[in-house]
Regions:
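C-terminal segment of N-terminal export signals and the immediately downstream linker at the start
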Residues: 1, 23-42
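Beta-alpha junction/loop-to-helix N-cap segments that form part of ligand/metal-binding clefts
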Residues: 48-55, 68-143, 149, 207-214, ...
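Segments of small-molecule ligand-sensing domains
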Residues: 305-321, 327-387
Length: 396
């Protein structure tokens, strides 16, 4: 049976405090399940990525268990819906470590939550893989247990800025983010980086993702002379309202920015399909097809593998493949002999690279940003095909 679409949009998160919890556990009985905690926003306004990741998580666990598990151990996914709330994420993390006795944790799925729980997991020594992009979430001295499976926001920001300045060849930039911890941090960094590279940031603001009327912000951006609008938000609802407002204003300006601008959720939120034109979202080589309509061979292999089992049409391919890769990275560590939390972390530090479907990840004891920068590209947001996208104009 296919994992079906759940119609949610993205949006809020805030930073919350953390509490001290227990120490890591080590040797496990051979027949004991391999318990992987999964911190996910599966409902609420920030749920679209979590839903996509969840499909990959479930498919990975089902596939591994159908093949006999890992060294005879069944994969058990311990899922907690955080609803994008850092406080709920903190409580779930403590439960997973202290009560559920998980062996590793995948997630959470947004940076506001991760800011709250990363120190907790570090104190407990729990192996953690996450897709959260705020640069400071990876620090091998403070958080030697934390590994990033997705690019950092710095890598995303570099791709967006390069596309705006070198391909679109614009100089007057408007930058808009939501009011989450992620949105505020991303806008601040983006403004500084554009200015550093000689661009004129004519307008910037953080707005509530639930704000219904985007006309005031769009009007200010146009009045300031913006030639492109850069968006940093995971809220597909907010993004769709911005696209619809652009059309209502008869303003032919480009959008560039966050990968969620290409989410299948947006299609149903648009007043007209053409409102999605001239929107360029961060993408990845592994999730992009060329003018011939073909994906890279390994990516096509995954599409074929999940056909009829996992829906890709209303989500992003990278969300599904990253979820799949994360579970397999835990399983691979155990398969290779890791018998403790410390062993799993030590094994991940030797991956040079790990051949996943989303990317080929390279980690060392000194570097836990594993995604290759060269594989971060821009995509035409409205060109989705099985959650993959046409490379944006200007790429060879």
């Amino acid at each position: 049976m296919s994992l079906t679409r759940r119609n949610f949009v993205l949006g809020t998160s805030a930073i919350a405090g953390a509490a001290i919890i227990g120490a890591p556990r080590y040797a496990h009985a051979a027949a004991e399940s391999l318990r992987i905690g999964w911190l996910a926003a599966l409902t609420g306004p920030s749920s679209a990525p979590g839903i996509g990741f969840d499909r990959g998580v479930k498919f990975a666990a089902d596939t591994l268990n159908a093949a006999g598990g890992v060294k005879g151990r069944k994969i058990e996914i311990v899922t907690r819906d955080t609803q994008g709330d850092p406080t709920k994420a903190v409580n779930a993390t403590q439960e997973m470590i202290n009560s559920q006795k998980v062996h590793a944790i995948w997630g959470p799925t947004n940076s506001g939550e991760s800011l709250a729980v990363t120190p907790i997991m570090a104190r407990a020594g729990i192996p953690n893989i996450h897709p959260c992009v705020i640069d400071t979430l990876i620090d091998t001295k403070k958080f030697p247990n934390a590994f990033r499976i997705a690019p950092s926001n710095g890598q995303w920001d570099d791709a967006v800025r390069s596309y705006c300045l070198k391909v679109l060849k614009v100089k007057k930039i408007a930058i808009i983010g939501d009011t989450t911890g992620y949105g505020v941090t991303a806008v601040k960094a983006c403004v500084a980086n554009f200015k550093r590279d000689g661009a004129d940031v004519v307008y910037s603001n953080n707005i509530d993702a639930t704000q219904t009327d985007m006309t005031p912000d769009m009007t200010r951006a146009r009045s300031a002379g913006a030639e492109v609008i850069v968006i940093w938000s995971v809220s597909t609802g907010m993004e769709a309202r911005l696209f619809n407002t652009r059309a209502e204003m008869n303003w032919d300006v480009n959008f560039a920015g966050h990968p969620s601008m290409a989410s299948g959720e947006i299609r149903g939120l648009l007043a007209k399909p053409q409102n999605w034109d001239k929107v360029y979202a961060v993408g990845y080589r592994s999730c992009s097809y060329g003018a011939d309509g073909k994906l890279p061979p390994k990516s096509q292999e995954f599409v074929d593998k999940v056909q009829g089992k996992v829906s890709l049409d209303d989500t992003l391919f990278w969300w599904v493949t990253a979820g799949y890769d994360a579970i397999n990275m835990v399983a691979k560590a155990v398969q290779e002999g890791a018998g403790s939390s410390k062993d799993i972390i030590a094994y991940w530090n030797t991956l040079h690279p790990y051949p996943g479907y989303f990317g080929n990840y390279t980690y060392t004891a000194e570097e836990h940003n594993g995604y290759p920068t060269a594989d971060v590209v821009m995509s035409a947001a409205n060109s989705a095909k099985h959650g993959t996208f046409l490379l944006a104009p200007g790429y060879v």
